[in-house]
Curated annotation (Swiss-Prot):
This is UPF0301 protein R00917. GO terms for cellular component: cytosol. InterPro entries: AlgH-like. Belongs to the UPF0301 (AlgH) family.
C-alpha cells in the first residue's frame, strides 16, 4: 500500500465512514451508479472504495498470483474460501489489494476506518482468509478511488454525489447489483426520484 494512502487514512475528516452515491449525471464513467465507502477524508484529499463493481479474478487466482499456494492446493481449498468475493475498488492502483473487514480480526497493519470496520492491505490477512482464520466479514478490493485536496467537496457541491452514513450490512453484501438501489433506500430515495438536476444531501 502506498505511503500517501496510509497517511490519508490516518487523517480523519467529516466524510469518514460515509457512503457516496453517484447521481445520474455523474460525468465520470468510472463512477456511474457506484456506491463508495469513504475510508478517509482530510484537507489533503479523500480515499474510498467502490462497493458494487465486480472483478473477474477469483480468490484462488489471487492466491496463485501471490504464490501463496500451488495449483494442486487451489483445488483443495474449502468452498467458502474459493468463493471469497473480489471486487474492483476503484481506478487508482488497480494492482494493489485491500481488505475491508470486521474488527474481529486485527494485525499490526490493520487500520480502523470506522467504529466497526478496519482496512488491512498486507499479505497476513490474505493468508488468514485462505486458512479459514480471517475476519467474520470481509471483502477484498483491487484498487481504490482517490481525490485530491478539495476535489471531492467540489464534486458534491456540483451534485455529483449524495452522501449518507455507511451501513455495515451493505458494505459486506455479496449482491452487488442491488447495492445502488439499497444505498438510495437508506436515504428514503428511489432511482425514479433522481434527476441530473437534483441537489445533494
Amino acid at each position: 500500500m502506498a505511503k500517501n494512502v496510509l497517511h490519508t487514512i490516518r487523517e480523519r475528516g467529516f466524510l469518514d465512514g460515509q457512503f457516496l452515491i453517484a447521481m445520474p449525471g455523474m460525468f465520470d464513467t468510472n463512477f456511474a451508479r457506484t456506491v463508495i465507502f469513504v475510508c478517509a477524508h482530510s484537507e489533503d484529499g479523500a480515499m474510498g472504495f467502490i462497493l458494487n463493481r465486480p472483478q473477474r479474478l477469483t480468490f484462488p487466482d489471487v492466491l496463485l498470483h501471490l504464490q501463496l499456494l500451488d495449483p494442486d492446493e487451489a483445488i483443495r481449498l474449502p468452498s467458502a474460501t474459493r468463493e471469497f468475493q473480489i471486487q474492483a475498488g476503484g481506478p487508482v492502483e488497480t494492482g494493489r489489494g485491500f481488505v475491508l473487514h470486521s474488527d474481529d480480526y486485527l494485525s499490526d497493519s490493520s487500520i480502523p476506518v470506522s467504529d466497526d470496520i478496519c482496512l488491512t492491505a498486507t499479505l497476513d490477512i490474505v493468508r488468514a482468509i485462505s486458512r479459514g482464520e480471517g475476519p467474520l466479514k470481509a471483502t477484498m478490493l483491487l484498487g481504490y478511488a482517490g481525490w485530491g485536496p478539495g476535489q471531492l467537496e467540489a464534486e458534491i457541491t456540483q451534485n455529483g454525489w449524495l452522501t449518507c452514513p455507511a451501513q455495515e450490512e451493505l458494505i459486506f453484501s455479496r449482491d452487488l447489483d442491488e447495492k445502488y438501489d439499497r444505498a438510495l433506500a437508506l436515504m428514503g430515495v428511489s432511482p425514479a426520484m433522481l434527476s441530473t438536476d437534483s441537489g445533494h444531501a
